[in-house]
């Protein structure tokens, strides 16, 4: 265990730094989701790695015949957490956790949600709006593009009250409306 007051890496770098297929896939994700660099892809992969590891541990506990109540509680906690975040459907199973893709994790980012819900013309513009404080969730300004939006918060995304973009006559809002048609 490290010192809690010190920041640590939240990602692991690839074991093979010059693997062409991985580089092309990461580049595609960076372009498609408007990410700043490949480190953001690695962070998303790290989060998925954590979920998959927990799912494998639950499956191992089931196969060894451990306390069934404890196994069910852990399973319900993991699946419930992923359902609240919007990554799994209501009738999901532990196998669905193992089948998660990095795109599903990246789709839950605030930057992606702002772009997909039509608040920005591109993922890069969505990132800019977020960092400049133009986007709020439930009336609370959020300035972190990598913020994971839960399924409940998804409907509460809007322009911040103090942002000039709140006005429908703002020139950028009109450009966004033209692109949306």
From Swiss-Prot:
Cross-referenced Pfam families: S4
GO biological process: ribosomal small subunit biogenesis; translation
Protein keywords: Ribonucleoprotein, Ribosomal protein, RNA-binding, rRNA-binding
Top-rank lineage group of the source organism: Archaea
Ranges in coiled-coil conformation: none
Similarity comment: family membership: Belongs to the universal ribosomal protein uS4 family.
Subunit structure: Part of the 30S ribosomal subunit. Contacts protein S5. The interaction surface between S4 and S5 is involved in control of translational fidelity.
Protein name stated in the entry: Small ribosomal subunit protein uS4
Gene that encodes it: rps4
